[in-house]
């Protein structure tokens, strides 16, 4: 077992009840183009077309052969594009339950399936996009290989669902999904889970993690078990997608069900909700928030994105919905107040005198932008064997060669989310990291 000692358990109010409830009926779903880094789509549909669940919507010009399929049957309602014609979302008005039938196999034969057969079925169904690479956090090429595949079956994000609760309802499908994954690599499949978690391992190698967040991030697991580099690529996948893999191969259907945690200080009844991938956030959170001036976030409060406009839909890789108050009110002389109701990692406020207290946090950054100030905050929350202050400095200054030498290729935006949270300078280090990774990949 690997214990993570550095990190942060964010004391935020609104933790969800770990019981799964049925969510509201979803009338609109969307595939979000900007979630797929570097995507240049070749559209196979147009507005007004009728589609079946699992039908191809578009393919990627830059990653030939990768297919993106419909998350529900219905009618193409919108194809939204942003600046420079970047695809933002393809919205489907849900109608009926027509679905494309895919190849299915006996569960006891999954261990012996031909690797190319497995790839073809995943690609045709669109589930290939559930896999992501390190370095670069992109959907792998259809002919790519991985030194190992990591299954993230532990979640330490604030307000997250317990994977054990979700997997308990699909243990056989999860085990079958692990068998499918094993056919994709000559290396090992690593099942990363919490200490003592009751999760079937099938033929995967179990690696247990304990400790503070980010003990549940794929980047943490990869760094400690099989580090990625310019010469070694590994893949990772979420536990609910592993369940979908198992159902695809044994039932021949594309399962787009997703259990998400709805939580946060402004959530009316924090709990786990069964919904679908790409669900409209307006429909999913209807009657779920308290009061006005609320921000709905797809994903974690640390690394999620605001669900608004053409992107107001549940993200492909997100397993929670966070609800916070918009922190747009300024507090006169707030810096001089005792702050008994405020949290600070540096113990600047008296809130630290109540270590078990949960805080009604808002979206406020607690001040304006300023210079980067290295006072030890980054080292407190970074459990990886890197020099965070030096790495972040190189990212801000544009010294990407230096950033790579310090370990940038191992990281994703979510791995630097805690550094962003504790930064006195209010920098979003994730965006600087993405600029670095894009530049390194482009220039080789």
UniProtKB/Swiss-Prot annotation:
Its EC number is 7.2.1.1. It comes from the Bacteria. Coiled coil: none annotated. GO terms for molecular function: oxidoreductase activity, acting on NAD(P)H, quinone or similar compound as acceptor. Keywords: Ion transport, NAD, Sodium, Sodium transport, Translocase, Transport, Ubiquinone. It catalyses: a ubiquinone + n Na(+)(in) + NADH + H(+) = a ubiquinol + n Na(+)(out) + NAD(+). It is an enzyme of class 7 (translocase). The keyword Cell division does not apply. InterPro entries: NqrA, NQRA_2nd, NqrA_C_domain, NQRA_N. GO terms for biological process: sodium ion transport. Composed of six subunits; NqrA, NqrB, NqrC, NqrD, NqrE and NqrF. NQR complex catalyzes the reduction of ubiquinone-1 to ubiquinol by two successive reactions, coupled with the transport of Na(+) ions from the cytoplasm to the periplasm. NqrA to NqrE are probably involved in the second step, the conversion of ubisemiquinone to ubiquinol. PANTHER family: NA(+)-TRANSLOCATING NADH-QUINONE REDUCTASE SUBUNIT A. Belongs to the NqrA family. This is Na(+)-translocating NADH-quinone reductase subunit A. It comes from Shewanella frigidimarina (strain NCIMB 400). The lineage of its organism: Bacteria, Pseudomonadati, Pseudomonadota, Gammaproteobacteria, Alteromonadales. The gene is nqrA.
């Amino acid at each position: 077992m690997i214990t993570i000692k550095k990190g942060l358990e964010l004391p935020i109010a609104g933790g969800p009840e770990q019981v799964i409830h049925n969510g509201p009926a979803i009338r609109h779903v969307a595939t979000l183009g900007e979630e797929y880094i570097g995507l240049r789509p070749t559209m196979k549909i147009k507005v007004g077309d009728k589609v079946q669940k699992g039908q191809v919507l578009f393919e990627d010009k830059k990653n030939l052969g990768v297919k993106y399929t419909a998350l529900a049957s219905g009618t193409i309602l919108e194809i939204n594009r942003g600046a420079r014609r970047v695809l933002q979302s393809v919205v489907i008005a849900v109608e009926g339950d027509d679905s494309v039938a895919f190849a299915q196999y006996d569960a006891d034969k999954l261990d012996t399936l031909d690797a190319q057969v497995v790839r073809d079925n995943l690609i045709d169904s669109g589930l290939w996009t559930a896999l992501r690479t390190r370095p670069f956090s992109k959907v792998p090429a259809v002919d790519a290989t991985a030194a190992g595949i990591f299954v993230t079956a532990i979640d330490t994000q604030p307000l997250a669902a317990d994977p054990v609760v979700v997997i308990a309802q699909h243990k056989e499908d999860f085990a079958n999904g692990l068998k499918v994954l094993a056919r994709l690599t000559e290396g090992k499949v690593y099942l990363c889970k919490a200490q003592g978690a009751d999760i079937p391992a099938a033929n995967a190698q179990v690696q247990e993690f304990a400790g503070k967040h980010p003990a549940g991030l794929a980047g943490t697991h990869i760094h400690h078990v099989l580090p990625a580099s310019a010469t070694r690529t590994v893949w990772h996948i979420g536990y609910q997608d592993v369940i979908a893999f198992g159902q695809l191969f044994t039932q021949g259907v594309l399962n787009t069900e997703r259990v998400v945690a709805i939580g946060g200080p402004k959530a009316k009844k924090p709990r786990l909700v069964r919904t679908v991938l790409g669900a409209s956030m307006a429909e999913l959170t209807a009657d779920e928030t308290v009061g006005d001036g609320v921000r709905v976030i797809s994903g974690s409060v640390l690394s999620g994105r605001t669900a608004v406009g053409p992107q107001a839909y549940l993200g492909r890789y997100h397993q929670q919905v966070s609800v916070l108050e918009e922190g747009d009110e300024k507090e006169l002389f707030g810096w001089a107040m005792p702050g008994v109701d405020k949290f600070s990692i540096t113990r600047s406020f008296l809130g630290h005198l109540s270590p078990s207290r949960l805080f009604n946090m808002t979206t406020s950054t607690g001040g304006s932008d300023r210079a980067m100030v290295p006072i030890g905050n980054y080292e407190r929350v970074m459990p990886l064997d890197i020099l965070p202050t030096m790495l972040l400095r190189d990212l801000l200054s544009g010294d990407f060669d230096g950033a790579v030498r310090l370990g940038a290729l191992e990281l994703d935006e979510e791995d630097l989310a805690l550094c962003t949270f504790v930064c006195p300078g209010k920098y979003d280090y994730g965006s600087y990291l993405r600029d670095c990774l894009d530049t390194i990949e482009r220039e080789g």
